[in-house]
């Protein structure tokens, strides 16, 4: 085993003593050349495709692995140092990437290095001890029913030309998938499903007789468990209306408009959302805001946290709901505050009322 830092006899003895200590502690460094990072990254990607992780997770990890390969792919994996890692992460920040994106990138790198350590290419990870980027916890805005209606109305308006808003004097047209897009918005609004969960719902997952829709019936929800969302009156009406116009050749509740002969679910409605929210002047509106809307309205309706958390797919009995989703509208808080009574009151009994 080479004595890497030995420039003289004293340094050689010091390095030798260090190696003896590492041997005694069973943490000797691997002998021989480690693979280039870019080569090992490909090994990791090959394993990732058969890891059982959800497709969305695989796509995200692949993006970050490719970024790391471009940044440090020329280095042998055992030569990767903390300054290489922090240099790339700070480069992402300079490129206006969010702190969350940088933290996700670091998580993916740690996954790669953990795999390399298991394979014997590393004894310790150079990413150990690196600090996470601090993320700002912003208060989420609660959109009103009128604002959601405005978004849906904008999605069906004749205001679009070649993937953008029509300019003054231009003749606009509707979004090609406008009706389906609005159905999707309403579905999220009335059942609280996550963006990707809703896209994977099949027609067979809707049980009108039993009065529920299954989210993640194939184990493809966020927590990999199926859950039943009971039909409220608006969700039932929406699903009945959708059934009248659904594509007879597709098993999906939201089939892809470009599926051709292959039956595929729609992959995303994000481009439609960008256009509709611009037209509705709701620039920060996101699909997850509809999940927050559902949770908040359910809580304001007096439904207990445990029931709502089950509809949302939480497994903590409502703790996260209380922290993250119970955003009560201003008028509701004021109404509840008006009901507070601090002075003594005389309650009328049934006997007194009948006399």
Predicted feature locations:
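N-terminal DNA-binding module of tyrosine recombinases/phage integrases
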Residues: 1-86
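Catalytic-site neighborhood detector that most strongly recognizes the C-terminal catalytic loop/helix
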Residues: 8, 142, 215-221, 312-342
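Short basic/aromatic active-site micro-motif
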Residues: 80, 179-182, 283-301
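Basic, Lys/Arg- and aromatic-enriched nucleic-acid-binding interface segment
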Residues: 102-105, 118, 122-123, 128-195, ...
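C-terminal catalytic core of tyrosine-transesterase DNA break-rejoin enzymes
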Residues: 118, 186-197, 291-315, 331
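C-terminal secondary-structure termini that scaffold catalytic or DNA-interacting sites
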Residues: 153-174, 210, 235, 241-248, ...
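Short, polar N-cap/turn motifs at the start of nucleic acid-interacting alpha helices
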Residues: 205-212, 284, 303-324, 334, ...
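C-terminal catalytic core of Y-nucleophile DNA break-rejoin enzymes
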Residues: 220-241, 250-274, 286
């Amino acid at each position: 085993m080479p004595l890497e830092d030995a420039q003289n006899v004293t340094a050689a003895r010091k390095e030798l003593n260090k190696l003896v200590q590492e041997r005694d502690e069973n943490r000797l460094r691997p002998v021989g050349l480690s693979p280039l990072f870019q080569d090992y990254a490909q090994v990791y990607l090959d394993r990732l495709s058969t890891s059982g992780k959800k497709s969305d997770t695989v796509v995200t990890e692949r993006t970050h692995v490719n970024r790391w390969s471009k940044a440090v792919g020329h280095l042998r994996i055992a030569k990767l140092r903390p300054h290489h890692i922090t240099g790339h992460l700070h480069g992402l920040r300079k490129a206006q990437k969010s702190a969350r994106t940088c933290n996700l990138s670091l998580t993916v790198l740690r996954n790669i290095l953990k795999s390399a350590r298991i394979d014997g290419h590393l004894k310790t990870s150079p990413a150990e001890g690196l600090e996470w980027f601090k993320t700002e916890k912003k208060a989420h805005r609660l959109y009103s029913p009128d604002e959601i209606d405005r978004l849906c109305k904008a999605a069906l308006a004749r205001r679009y030309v070649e993937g953008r808003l029509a300019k003054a004097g231009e003749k606009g047209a509707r979004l090609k998938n406008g009706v389906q897009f609005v159905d999707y918005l309403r579905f999220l609004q009335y059942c609280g499903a996550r963006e990707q969960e809703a896209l994977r719902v099949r027609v067979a997952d809707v049980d009108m007789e039993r009065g529920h829709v299954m989210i993640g019936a194939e184990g493809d929800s966020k927590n990999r468990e199926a859950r039943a969302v009971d039909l409220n009156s608006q969700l039932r009406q929406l699903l009945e209306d959708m059934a009248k116009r659904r594509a007879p050749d597709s098993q999906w509740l939201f089939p892809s408009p470009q599926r051709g002969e292959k039956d595929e679910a729609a992959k995303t409605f994000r481009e439609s959302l960008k256009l509709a929210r611009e037209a509705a002047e709701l620039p920060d509106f996101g699909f997850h805001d509809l999940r927050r809307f559902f949770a908040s309205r359910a809580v304001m309706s007096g439904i207990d946290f445990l029931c709502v958390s089950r509809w949302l797919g939480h497994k903590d009995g409502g703790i996260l709901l209380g922290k993250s989703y119970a955003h009560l509208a201003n008028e509701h808080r004021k109404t509840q505050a008006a009901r507070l009574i601090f002075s003594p009151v005389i309650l009328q009994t049934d006997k007194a009322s009948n006399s």
